[in-house]
């Protein structure tokens, strides 16, 4: 046998020994006392389906009207997050506006910088760019956007009548058929801890 094989065999034996020791350590992990090995029974967990309540909010819209989440109590609505500088978001807002009933959209600006704080200007700019009237509240609310963890816009949260975030749509969406399906599902969506959601959305 060549002398060059001997170091190789030694290395192989050390590797095997290391693997055996690691296996023993893993098997003992979490069992540091004798009591840990006695009387253990299977742990049964009843995990509830995940659901998030949409935060309670209040603010003043572009017409200086005070508005809060209680105005949408016991009915579905769309919380739409964007910013005045997001020109490409307008086509999505236009699509949502054509489907969602009057009084069922709240438009929030996530932009906290002072030069974008005028909601009346944003509202007028939207009407000019879309070439039509736009009767929805525009509300400055970067704090709510942070609470909802808005990172990309447009960011639309479909809130059901229980106040739960039923569906979140991020990015451009102009498929009116899909938006109608999501809205219809939101209006009939109900969450129970025992059964979860009664409706589900297939992403468009």
Which residues does each PLM region occupy?
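Secretory targeting signatures
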Residues: 1-50, 204
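N-linked glycosylation sites
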Residues: 58, 64, 74, 102, ...
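Short acidic-hydrophobic, aromatic-tinged amphipathic segments that line or gate anion-handling sites
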Residues: 60, 135-142
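Short active-site neighborhood of thiol/selenol oxidoreductases, capturing the structured segment around
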Residues: 67-90, 106-108
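Loop/turn elements at helix/coil->beta-strand transitions in domains of secreted/extracellular proteins
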Residues: 73-77, 101-106, 134-136, 153, ...
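Structural microenvironment flanking redox-active thiols in thiol-disulfide oxidoreductases
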Residues: 90-129, 140-147, 197-201
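Thiol/disulfide oxidoreductase modules built on the thioredoxin-like
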Residues: 140-187
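Short, low-complexity, Pro/Ser/Thr/Gly-rich segments in the mature regions of secreted, periplasmic
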Residues: 188-204
């Amino acid at each position: 046998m060549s002398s060059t094989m001997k170091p190789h065999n030694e290395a192989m034996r050390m590797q095997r020994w290391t693997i055996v020791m690691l296996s023993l350590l893993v098997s003992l992990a979490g069992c540091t006392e004798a009591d840990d090995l006695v009387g253990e029974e299977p742990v049964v967990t009843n995990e509830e389906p995940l659901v998030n309540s949409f935060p309670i909010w209040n603010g003043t819209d572009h017409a200086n009207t005070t508005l809060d989440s209680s105005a949408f109590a016991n009915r579905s609505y769309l919380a739409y997050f964007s910013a005045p500088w997001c020109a490409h978001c307008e086509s999505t807002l236009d699509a949502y506006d054509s489907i969602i009933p009057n009084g069922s959209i709240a438009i929030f600006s996530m932009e906290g910088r002072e030069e974008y704080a005028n909601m009346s200007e944003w509202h007028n700019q939207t009407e000019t760019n879309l070439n039509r009237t736009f009767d929805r509240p525009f509300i400055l609310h970067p704090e709510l956007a942070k609470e909802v963890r808005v990172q990309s816009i447009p960011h639309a949260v479909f809130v059901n009548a229980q106040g739960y975030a039923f569906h979140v749509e991020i990015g451009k969406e102009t498929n009116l058929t899909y938006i109608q399906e999501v809205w219809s599902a939101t209006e009939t969506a109900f969450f129970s801890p025992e059964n979860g959601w009664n409706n589900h959305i297939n992403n468009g």
